[in-house]
Amino acid sequence: MNEDLGVFNKEFKEIINVGDAFDLLIEDNKDILEQLQEEIGFNYVRMINVFSPDMGIFPGSKFFNWTRAYDIFEYVESLNLKPLIILNFKNFSDYEILAILTSFLEYFNDVEGLNFKNFKFQFDTKIKKDLSHEIKIILEDQYNLEVLDNCYHLFDYTNSIYDTAYMLPYIIHNSIYNLSSLYYIKAFDTLDKQVNLTNEVFFGYPGLVNSKGIKKPSYYAYYLLNMLGNTLVSIDKGFIVTKSHSEYQILLYSFNESFNNLLNFKNVDKIKKTQNVTNKLSINILNIKSNTRIIEYDINEKSGSSFDYWISMGKPKRLKKEEKEILHKSSFPKINFRYSKKSTVLNIQATLKGYSAKLIILKET
């Protein structure tokens, strides 16, 4: 391969979900979001329940206190993120909703220290059509603010598969092909909605990082995607090749035609039956004009997957300090270095087993 296919659009970096806005007042969650922003870098942070008692907004109130909302938006802006606010309202009348929104808009339009024009909005699927129409007119016509065309489906389901290495190829494949919305993926796990817990480590919440601050395989799907270049060189099922300056990036991931449906199983044991697929790939890179340093990042069920390490520990319901430290330190892709002398054709071969991903970076020296 030696021809470019155009710009590689990293749309997966546009939005990161955090769930309840109130969760961004919790220091552990803020630490996770800061690391996500540092290592991946998103554009918007989508939050729900901005207009709720947790945020100091109560049904029947004649005055609305926006202190918590301001603190959150100020923090978000400090991370070079912009707020995407879901317009969902619980236990408020239509009259109250309009009063709340009017107060919100007047307050943040006048307040100093925030770029209010960067705010975006999106309707909850449950909001009344006539009410949403009225709100949209206020936001767009009176304040010149953007409202997304599609509505947001509030998602609070759990699925044990979200914790597993299966999410590596699933997220990568759907991200590079823009096949399905990953709107349910969140920055971090939260405990407040979990009723039938069996442990405090992994409980099937769709966060990239669990409640102990341990990164899941899904985190590294985005981590590896973000290391891709901005120019698309080649793409097919199971791999994508990009480049930037004097560097090529080859991201390989395990692929089979049915794996996109496996989330419907909601059971780790069932997806184990499909994981014995082996993917072999061979890619030729042409016209490398100098010696090449090769860096490989590998993550799979046997290497780098916090969930599988936890299983190997015997699925402890609660982590001891030492166990937590082990999971923190070991949950990272395995890194290998190689060196290749100048050649007309550089052949890259790789074998992927089970649910896995491999990023190969070629740097001209």
Annotate the PLM regions.
Residues 232-242:
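Short catalytic/ligand-gating loop segments at beta-alpha or beta-beta junctions
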